[in-house]
Amino acid sequence: MPRYRLTVEYDGSDYVGWQRQDNGPSVQGAIEKAVLSLTRETVSIRGAGRTDSGVHARGQVAHLDLTREWKSYTLQNALNAHLALAGERVSILDVAEAPGDFDARFSAIRRHYLYRIISRRSPLALEARRAWWVPKPLDHDAMHEAAQRLVGHHDFTTFRSAHCQATSPLRTLDRLDVTRAGELIEIRATAQSFLHNQIRSFAGSLKLVGEGKWTPDDLQAALEARDRKACGPVAPPDGLYFMRVDY
């Protein structure tokens, strides 16, 4: 059976997340329905990351197996047509044939995420579900300085969900940068893999630094506590984007 690699963009606002669930529409389910409508095949696709409800993607990667061969551009266009017809906020950006041993999740060597904060007094209208609105001024330089305390190999118990199913809290964070362009603050994170709610936990804690409520030393102390209770507030899902996967 030929295997295909899909690069997927989606607005996660109205989905329960990437993974198929019984309590509402999922991105995985939307694509699987489009495949069924197109090919009459029931497939199970695997994504590189299981984004939560409200989290967006600009470069999620998934793979699926089909019984017949398709030209990549034909499959891409056809799936997009079926997704659009169903009113889904999902777009297939690219389709490529993949080797049989390619796995969107387990073949990944690096994942890239972006968290967007808009720091201004006025509420968001156009980007209300695409960024975290923070009405207070934030010191992005202090946030970036603090973020560097988290880079490297650490026990990230403080910054993972209490419901995280990973067997180990140890992860290697390759990059955590905070930059600003006008009212937009961007937090970019790179690692081979992340724990559940890890980036949103980073963002919420870094916001405390930006407000002057925490210092970089406070953030490091939270990391070293290895205690979920030491974490700052978890940032909302609206500002989080799954940007890219390296293989």
Swiss-Prot record:
Residue pairs linked by disulfide bridges in the UniProt entry: none
PANTHER family linked: PSEUDOURIDYLATE SYNTHASE (PTHR11142), TRNA PSEUDOURIDINE SYNTHASE-LIKE 1 (PTHR11142:SF0)
Keyword list, A-Z: Isomerase, tRNA processing
Catalytic activity: uridine(38/39/40) in tRNA = pseudouridine(38/39/40) in tRNA
Top EC class of this enzyme: isomerase
UniProt-recorded name of the protein: tRNA pseudouridine synthase A
Biological role: Formation of pseudouridine at positions 38, 39 and 40 in the anticodon stem and loop of transfer RNAs.
Subunit structure: Homodimer.
UniProt keyword Transcription present: no
UniProt GO BP: tRNA pseudouridine synthesis
Ligand binding (substrate): Y113
One GO MF term: RNA binding
Mitochondrion in keyword set: no
Family statement drawn from the similarity comment of this UniProt entry: Belongs to the tRNA pseudouridine synthase TruA family.
EC number: 5.4.99.12
Pfam family, one: PseudoU_synth_1
Coiled-coil annotated spans: none
Annotated organism of origin: Rhizobium meliloti (strain 1021) (Ensifer meliloti)
Active site: D52 (nucleophile)
